[in-house]
Amino acid sequence: MKFGGTSVADAERIKRAAERIVRAKEAGTRVVAVLSARGKHTDELVSLAYEVSDRPDPREMDMLLSTGERVTCALAAMVINDLGHEAISLTGSQAGIVTDSGHTKARIIEVKADRIRSGLDDGKIVLVAGFQGVSQESYDVTTLGRGGSDTTAVAVAAALGADVCEIYTDVAGVFSADPRIVPEARKLPVLTFEEMLEMSASGAGVLQLRSVEYARNHGVTIHCRSSFEDGPGTVVQDEELTMERPLVTAVTHSTSEARITLTGLPDVPGIAGRVLTALADANINVDMIIQNEPQSDGHLADMSFTVPRDDVATARESLEALQPELGFGGVQSDDRMGKVSIVGAGMKSHPGVAAKTFTVLGDAGVNIEMISTSPIKISCVVREEHVEEAVRKLHTAFELGADAVLPEDVAGVHRPKVA
């Protein structure tokens, strides 16, 4: 089980989460619960760091940010003990979450779950602080980046061979669009890992991308449910769905995109690889990439790509350091970009989806600035102020509303028992 920040935002919600954990235990389940920091606590810690330092040291940021989850776990353990059950709270390090040394964006290398198993064997409920681990090299505290508690939960589930990893959030499951933008969006009962990966990469905030990748790679079924109501939620699994999938499953969006353009880049073999290697070394994820035709002299071109908005300053610094070596004209950035995507396994076997997408956006007066496609996804970069209108128009055009007919019960689908 994993409870997100809104599910443990205050004392009352921590009590409610603890009561749900206890119910699962009383139903005969051996329970490990991964907990996030309370509400906006992590954001408050980040703001505090920047109040005292213009450029906080990444190692010290990890020391600071890892405290939030520890507070939640300790409080939840107190509640569970008061409810008559024995609980033990563990930091990421104590739980055996071993990572690389990438401070603020560390990756899990392995989970040494001996201490978790020992707690379970003693009949205890084990509470694990999400979002954190310990460096294999330096033994320093590390954090996993935004949404890292999802990854912690899936990694622990995989290490324990758990039947399912239940992710509890403030929404009832995964929807065909953000209900705050599209009120008629419908809940999706089941998704393949392939679909969920594309949705997470395109802005769907219910599950963090790395957690879905980890679940797919280790065969862990994920069950997304609401902390505040009982219901079937959404199951994400690796089994092929035997019924025909709808053409488009969902419309996702992101308003945290930035575009960076390198002007006057010499058009020679290997230079794009050099640029992208520098960004990878800075731990910056590059999404869409386009390079125009060389200019009239045949030797210079412009190269544009998108990165997370929070990484613009670091990306510019890395690229400007390359300028003397590569000899390009300059670095330009625009951080007021957004991305709109349509996702659906049914797109594999249906032509014309891209044409319909571009026509719908064109009729709505939304200019497409960059395009990326995969067999089950089409993504368009647009101005940030056009994102919500684009989402609504595409959701309507592909008939994804509450009255849409989607397969509710699919042969071969494993549906975890509701606790």
Q: Predicted regions span which residues?
A:
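Residue-identity detector for threonine
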Residues: 6, 29, 42, 66-67, ...
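Non-catalytic alpha-helical coupling and interface elements of nucleotide-dependent molecular machines
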Residues: 50, 54, 85, 219-223, ...
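Conserved dinucleotide-binding and phosphotransfer motif residues
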Residues: 27, 83, 218, 282, ...
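Active-site phosphate/pyrophosphate-binding segments
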Residues: 228
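Nucleotide/pyrophosphate-binding catalytic subdomain
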Residues: 1-212, 382-383, 402, 409-419
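Structural motif
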Residues: 29-33, 62-63, 86-88, 117-118, ...
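A conserved regulatory-domain signal marking ACT and ACT-like small-molecule sensing domains
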Residues: 232-419
